[in-house]
Every structure is written in C-alpha cells, then in structure tokens.
Amino acid sequence: MKKEVIVGSRDSALALWQTNWVVERLSKIHPEINFKIVTMKTKGDKILDVALAKIGDKGLFTKELEHALLNKTIDMAVHSMKDLPTVLPEGLKIGAFCEREYPGDVFISPKGFKFLELPQGARIGTSSLRRIAQILAVRPDLQAIPLRGNLPTRFRKMEEMDLDGIILAYAGVKRLGYEDKITEMLSFDLCLPAVGQGSIGVEIRADDTFIEELLKPIDHFATNRAIRAERAFLKRLEGGCQIPIGAYSEVKENRLHLKGVVASLDGKLVIKGEKEGSIEEPEKVGISLAEELLTKGAQKILEEIRRDANE
C-alpha cells in the first residue's frame, strides 16, 4: 500500500490550482507516495468586507493551515509566498520555494484605458496599500476603491461598480486563465510587487526530515535566494499588510539583485533603493537594503503609519 502524505490548502480556486501544481510535480517525482489534498478556510477567506490592512492580523491566510501542521493533521501546507508572514510559528519552516511565475502586477480596464492614460479622478479597484501608495505617487488624482474577493468576484464588482480599472497580480490572473482580460503589464518602475509575489511556498514541520527530502527537487534555487532576500528586507522593516512596502529580487550573472520601496499611504513620499550581493547571503542583501532605506526616510514613514494605526 502507498504511503500517504496529507497536503493542506486553502479552498479558493487559485489556492487549489497552486496546490494541485505542487502535488502533480511531487507525484511524478515520488510515484510511490499518495498525496492527498485537504482544504480549509482561513480567517482571510471568511472576512471579505474589510480591507486586509484594517484587520491587521498577520497570517490571515495561513494560521489555520499552520495549526493543522503543528497538530500533525497535515504534513505540508501550500501557500502563496506573499501571504506567508516573515516570522513563522515555532516548529515550522519553509520546505520549498517553487519556481516563480512573473511577479509583477497587471492593470485591467473594462474601458480599455492604459494606466497612464486614465482620465482625471479615475476609480481604480484595489485594497492593497502597497499598490495604492505607488499608483498615487504617479497619479495623485486617482481614487482607490476597496476591492477584495476571488478573481471572478473582483471582475464582477469591477463591472457592477463601473470602475475604470483594477490592479491584480499577474500570477493569479494567468493561473486561472484570465490573461485575455489584461490591458497592461505594470512595470516595476511604476509598481514594485509584494514580497514573494508569484511564488508558491510549501511550509512543513521543522523536524520532519522525510517531508523535507521529498520537497528538495521542487525547491527552485534562484527563487529560493530571491525570496529569502525579499523576506529579510520586509522582516527588517517589520512590515505587514498595513504598510506600503514592495520588493523584487532576481539572480543575474550569479549575483543577487534586490529592489525595494517604502511609501507613505498617500504616495507623497516614496523611498526606493537597490542592492546587489552574493547569492549565498540573501538575508544579508535584504537587511542591508532595508537599513539603507530606513536611513533615507523610510523610518519616518513607518513611524507615522504605526502611530496613526494605533490612534
């Protein structure tokens, strides 16, 4: 009889696509194992009428899966890397960083507008503070309209609310087959992605060497190094979804290149920077860029946002 490995997943269409993607690869590599998917709803799936920044809870899309891991009811949990907090619960770790899809954002306009050609005061659907701050930095006249839910829900709301456009992660749009709706790919100069965007991560128990070995073939070297740098950058800034922070790292010619941004909520102050370093020291690259941005003015932005959040 085949050994069974239980894989935990959120129950959204995108989460299941990603979990099936992981399981298909693992099943080919380990045909002697039966991988069984178990789904569950997270707090972030249940609260859809409030912006994530207002809920203000880390691990909104991961906690239930992490509890199942720690309770040993599942053997691994598949996440969007951008949902995984930089500090994991004690006893858990990331077992694999799967090869990254293009991590950028896309602009979708039912009216066919290119982003920079939007009319004055155009209404753009997004609840992401990172996206709002970066688009306001370029177009302060735009109105950001809160928009949450799965992709079909967002497309429906876009039409119902007569929005001029919405901003989404390319990876999710592609994975669910909505590429034909894309009006424009947003450049990194305009909008740096969320930390980990475009990559699927597999979380495991830190002491489970059997599962760790199973995952090694799907841990993608360049993605592993890039996202570790981004996560170290975010962790040093102590940023969650309440703070507009973007980052993108890639391996080029055996060196790690990292771009980062911290912005005020209104987009009036934007602190950007870049860092290059050794692929063997991704955390060092991330921390170094974070500290550089803190001295360039990011510290002031972070303090103001945290003070306002506590009032």
From Swiss-Prot:
SUPFAM superfamilies: Periplasmic binding protein-like II, Porphobilinogen deaminase (hydroxymethylbilane synthase), C-terminal domain. Its EC number is 2.5.1.61. The keyword ATP-binding does not apply. The keyword Transport does not apply. Keywords: Porphyrin biosynthesis, Transferase. It holds the Pfam family Porphobil_deam. Transmembrane segments: none annotated. Pathway: Porphyrin-containing compound metabolism; protoporphyrin-IX biosynthesis; coproporphyrinogen-III from 5-aminolevulinate: step 2/4. One of its GO terms (cellular component) is cytoplasm. It comes from the Bacteria. GO terms for molecular function: hydroxymethylbilane synthase activity. PANTHER family: PORPHOBILINOGEN DEAMINASE. Tetrapolymerization of the monopyrrole PBG into the hydroxymethylbilane pre-uroporphyrinogen in several discrete steps. The porphobilinogen subunits are added to the dipyrromethane group. Monomer. This is Porphobilinogen deaminase. The lineage of its organism: Bacteria, Bacillati, Bacillota, Clostridia, Thermoanaerobacterales. The gene is hemC.
